[in-house]
Amino acid sequence: MKVLLFVLSLFFVTLSFAQDSTKVKLKEWVGVLTVTEKFADEKNWTAAEQSIVGEHFQRLIKMKEKGIVVLAGRMELPVSDPNMQGLVIFYAKDEKEANEFMMNDPAVKNKIMNAKVVPYGIAVSACK
């Protein structure tokens, strides 16, 4: 009986490791967002653009809750400042998926923001 329990426990341990090895390891990426030239001038913002940026923010929150987004934020600079950028650190399996993630952002799709995707590696983090 002890042998049977031992063999069964080995089977289940092996099975659990086998399942982990089939998972695709996600890579870290950073999406760099910049405001398009038209919207660098705050006079060009309407309620429609404000609403789209609200959708952009809600999407980031939803993706954070799903474990895709690690963190997202923007520099505390005026929209008109050429150095102003937003950053999104997130997980994707490959460059294609990373680009799709950023290009499907409502602010990017509606040409309010431009997005660039770069491979990234988190070295130190307090994020959980």
Language-model segment annotations:
Residues 1-22:
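Bacterial Sec-dependent N-terminal signal peptides
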Residues 19-128:
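Conserved, structured core segments of small domains
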